[in-house]
């Protein structure tokens, strides 16, 4: 369901999950675009030489995927804050599933709190966090 205004939001509502493109090619392009090019983002072998299990999905890219999930659910929302904890690396070429659930609604202020996760295809939580989102009170 697409949220138009704060009255459309339901406590406990789960946002539609999102599986972004975490291919090595996409992660490499993103890393270079933000000035983070290097083996850990551009090559599985290079990342392994640095002690990682494979090439990494840049952390800010994962946060971007979280914001995409929010805006797909509520296109007119303004994201006030996203707070994340990176529990384990996100690995390129591995499915990442972004999920979120509404955990608080302040109708007077037009604010919604979301608990968010990024899990891999084995169901392991790689990133977790919360988002505070301002949603219009009327369409």
Give a label for each model feature.
Residues 1-55:
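Catalytic strand-loop segment that frames the active site of acyl-thioester-processing enzymes
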Residues 1-15, 89-92, 99-139:
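HotDog/MaoC-like acyl-thioester-processing domains
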Residues 19, 81-83, 128-132:
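Well-ordered beta-strand positions in beta-sheet-rich domains
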Residues 32-36, 71-75, 121:
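Short, intrinsically disordered, mixed-charge
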Residues 48-102:
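Hydrophobic beta-strand-centered segment that forms part of the acyl-chain substrate-binding groove
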């Amino acid at each position: 369901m697409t949220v138009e205004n704060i009255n459309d939001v339901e406590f406990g509502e789960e946002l539609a999950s999102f599986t972004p493109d975490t291919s090595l090619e996409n992660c490499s392009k993103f890393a270079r675009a933000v000035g983070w090019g290097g083996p850990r983002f551009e090559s599985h072998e290079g990342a392994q030489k640095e002690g990682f299990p494979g090439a990494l999905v840049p952390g800010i890219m994962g946060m971007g995927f979280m914001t995409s999930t929010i805006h797909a659910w509520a296109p007119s929302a303004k994201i006030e804050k996203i707070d994340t904890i990176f529990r384990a690396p996100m690995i390129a070429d591995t499915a990442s599933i972004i999920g979120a659930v509404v955990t608080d609604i302040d109708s007077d202020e037009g604010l919604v709190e979301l608990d968010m996760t990024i899990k891999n295809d084995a169901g392991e939580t790689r990133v977790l966090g919360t988002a505070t989102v301002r949603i219009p009170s009327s369409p």
